[in-house]
Regions:
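C-terminal motif of bacterial Sec signal peptides marking the signal peptidase cleavage site
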Residues: 30-33
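Bacterial N-terminal signal peptides that target proteins for export
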Residues: 3-22
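Conserved functional acidic sites
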Residues: 35-279
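Alpha-helical transmembrane segments
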Residues: 25-28
Length: 279
């Protein structure tokens, strides 16, 4: 009886030790998995946005504006010139970029008129952009790898274009709500692309938003004049050793038909930039 009891106790003890060994092994595996650091081979952000005083980019700008039910498109040329470097309030090197505008058909340097200025701030992990309205974006982020996602608009106010701007510059819509939650994603890395007939290599695509409400598959036409419809689209492309080569932003609403506007009406804007020259 004593031997049998001893054997059962010993067997129980061995089973308990085995269970604890399994638990400890599992915990060790979990901690090992948690402590593992993935490493990515990535280009530097400076390769996709080379910045130095005197650097310039010239773009073809297609601008869309709405007048009641009419969609009006106009075309210009923009020239962005890195004008100077300064320090921001965090003592970070900041590049001031002056933007000029002229008619799309012009080739005269005297036709350029200053439109405004914006700022580019390269940090150790991101490229920050502060635009004409003092809105800040994280335009690029390390590592530059496919499907990396980040909240590039996280610094924006809740309704940047409808509430944060001065009344004379604001839009009476709500489609800008939630822009701070947009997911910037690298949907293309190291690709070939053609913009306005010019071929580029090593192109990075940053998809920012692509959302529609009550639109036909063309994403431009409401399903009915009686429907409230929205369009929010944003994307950028950068070419290695060149910079921004393409940008598109659509932000607009269609309001349903009414006695005063039987076709409904639109509120909002759209822009498209395509690089045509640079140094």
């Amino acid at each position: 009886m004593i031997n049998q009891s001893f054997q059962e106790t010993n067997r129980f003890s061995m089973n308990s030790r085995l269970q604890w060994l399994i638990v400890i092994a599992c915990i060790t595996m979990v901690f090992a998995a948690c402590s593992k650091t993935d490493t990515y081979k990535s280009d530097q952000l400076s390769e996709y946005m080379p910045l130095q005083k005197g650097k310039y980019w010239i773009y073809l700008l297609d601008s869309t504006n709405f007048y009641n039910s009419q969609r009006v498109q106009t075309q210009y040329q923009l020239k962005d010139v890195v004008d100077d470097t300064l320090k921001d309030n965090l003592n970070r090197t900041t590049y001031r970029v002056i933007r000029y505008i002229r008619p799309s058909s012009s080739t005269s340097d005297s036709a350029w008129n200053i439109m405004g200025e914006y700022y580019l701030i390269p940090t150790t992990q991101t490229l920050e952009t502060i635009d004409f309205f003092n809105f800040k974006y994280q335009s690029l982020k390390l590592p530059v790898v496919l499907n990396l996602t980040w909240k590039g608009n996280s610094y924006l106010p809740a309704f940047p274009y409808s509430e944060a701007l001065p009344v004379q510059s604001s839009y009476n819509f709500t489609v800008d709500g939630g822009m701070g939650d947009w997911d910037y994603t690298y949907t293309g890395v190291g690709e070939n692309d053609t913009i306005n007939g010019i071929a580029y290599t090593n192109v990075v695509t940053v998809s920012q938003e692509d959302a529609s409400t009550n639109l036909l598959p063309d994403n431009q036409t409401p399903t009915s004049v009686n429907d409230f419809a929205t369009r929010a689209y944003s994307a950028e492309k950068y070419a290695k050793n060149i910079g921004l080569i393409y940008k598109k932003l659509e932000l607009w609403e269609h309001q349903p038909a009414s006695p005063t506007n039987p076709g409904g009406y639109y509120v909002g804007f759209g822009i498209q930039l395509q690089l045509i020259d640079h140094n």
